[in-house]
Amino acid sequence: MEGGRDLIYISSDLHLNHDKPFIYTARGYSSVEEMNKDLITKFNNTVTDEDEVYILGDLCLGGADSLIDNFKMLSQLNGNIHIILGNHDTETRRKMYEALPQVVSISYAETIHYRKYHFYLSHYPTLTANLDDDKPLRARTINLCGHSHVTDPFADWGKGCIYHCEVDAHNGFPISLDTIIEDMKRRVQEDEARYAKQLAALKKCFDEPFTKVNTIIQIQPIANCDKCISTPGYDCPGVQNPFYDRCPEGHKYQRDPPDGGYYS
């Protein structure tokens, strides 16, 4: 409980009983048994039985002979569990999930509205995430996902409003929606500061030449071209635009700036 209310947690890709070194060694474990035990401990040290938990797929692996062992491990998990199916969640495993007493729902995707924020939960990263970066965070659709086993929750941030919830990205722990919101607000603020700095640098690059061009235009208007100036009473249209190489009549004209000046 925090502030007198139950929390909502998100996790993904536990891969319990996935007896492949590229999974458990990448997470810093010496064996799949060590990984299983540690992930369950971290889960239950974070989540209470009163909390809601969304697991975004790939809870466990292993052959048919591992079903009973997987059922026993998953039965230990705290919370009211909502499962979003992943690519390793076969029909056989889905039936096993349905038999777990703490599982509340099983689906392929879910939408959550929380603290005026809008979340789309899926196993895979999805372009459902709103790409309007200029909108406030509360006006965007935030995609919470897993699948990729990245260690950076913002690994797909440049593709949209996407936040990774794999245990790989959170040191094995489930993460609360409140923490996700604060994490994303911090990232948005960092992006805005970085964009402002880049814009200031870009503006500085252009300010000097633009100022010089404006000064040149003010102190030395472009003269009429040779042909137009020789026609009495005719004002060459080229005088109005110093960036033309030729006047609208097609006549080339002289546009040398003062010493030290230049046109862009």
What are these regions (language model features)?
Residues N45, D134-P136, Q220:
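Structural motif
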Residues M1-D6:
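Short, Lys/Arg-enriched N-terminal segments with co-localized hydrophobic residues
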Residues S11, L16-E110, F206:
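Core catalytic region of metal-dependent phosphoesterases/phosphodiesterases
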Residues A99-R194:
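Conserved beta-sheet core of the metallophosphoesterase superfamily
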Residues L202-S264:
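Cysteine-centered metal-binding/redox modules
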Residues T48, R138-A139, A223:
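Structured loop/turn residues at beta-strand edges in well-structured enzyme cores
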